Amino acid sequence: MPKLILCRHGQSEWNAKNLFTGWEDVQLSEQGRNEAITSGRKLKENGIEIDVAFTSLLTRALETTQFLLAESDQEWIPVHKSWRLNERHYGKLQGLNKDEARKEFGEEQVHQWRRSYDVKPPAQTEEQRESYLKDRRYRHLDHRMMPYSESLKTTLERVVPIWTDKISQHLLDGETVLVAAHGNSIRALIKYLDNVSDEDIIGYEIKTGAPLIYELDDNLNVIDHYYL
């Protein structure tokens, strides 16, 4: 029976500082590393054997994958990295303290940017975007596909192709697949898998560094899902 493991990265240094992160590349905090290690230990204790892993191009997700696989004695499995699993792009909000953003733009406006399904934060300027265009990890990505800002809706639109083309193919072969990614890219996958409404998905909270197990039938319909 195919099994999907969704794991949001452990707490990052910017999570700890209450900053909007998005596509900014930051490392795990000490707490985040411990969360990832604990997740790997839980997988090992529950006898879960992973066949293949998928993660984003951002360090906090890569570190989570590494710690989780090392702790579960599965470092040798193939790991595929893709920009499509990156966190939602928060545009001009990236790097801002969330409390300071609320003071500047208003509580209601920031809540709408964060929690509405199809509302994007203010877009980055060309100058702000330049650092991504020069980043080697995106050198094979058509720059026209690189976002200036994203809503959860547009995040879902870029996540679905990697599900359809790659992740689901391993599951259809009966494999156990780990996806170690980010709050919003995982939220997008959950919406897609569980057919969650636009209104309901915005209230979903994804725990950091905690394996969320999806048990699927042979047609990839959801049988059950639960946190370890």
From Swiss-Prot:
Listed CDD domains: HP_PGM_like (cd07067)
Site (Transition state stabilizer): H182
Biological or metabolic pathway of the protein: Carbohydrate degradation; glycolysis; pyruvate from D-glyceraldehyde 3-phosphate: step 3/5
Gene Ontology molecular-function annotations: phosphoglycerate mutase activity
Gene3D superfamilies, alphabetized: Phosphoglycerate mutase-like
Gene name of this polypeptide: gpmA
Record GO biological process: gluconeogenesis; glycolytic process
Family: Belongs to the phosphoglycerate mutase family. BPG-dependent PGAM subfamily.
Keyword terms, alphabetized: Gluconeogenesis, Glycolysis, Isomerase
Keyword NADP: no
Top-level taxon: Bacteria
Enzyme Commission (EC) number: 5.4.2.11
Catalytically driven reaction(s): (2R)-2-phosphoglycerate = (2R)-3-phosphoglycerate
HAMAP family xrefs: PGAM_GpmA
Its job: Catalyzes the interconversion of 2-phosphoglycerate and 3-phosphoglycerate.
Residues reported in the UniProt entry to bind substrate: 8-15, 21-22, 60, 87-90, 98, 114-115, 183-184
Protein name: 2,3-bisphosphoglycerate-dependent phosphoglycerate mutase
Active-site residues, as the UniProt record annotates them: H9 (tele-phosphohistidine intermediate), E87 (proton donor/acceptor)
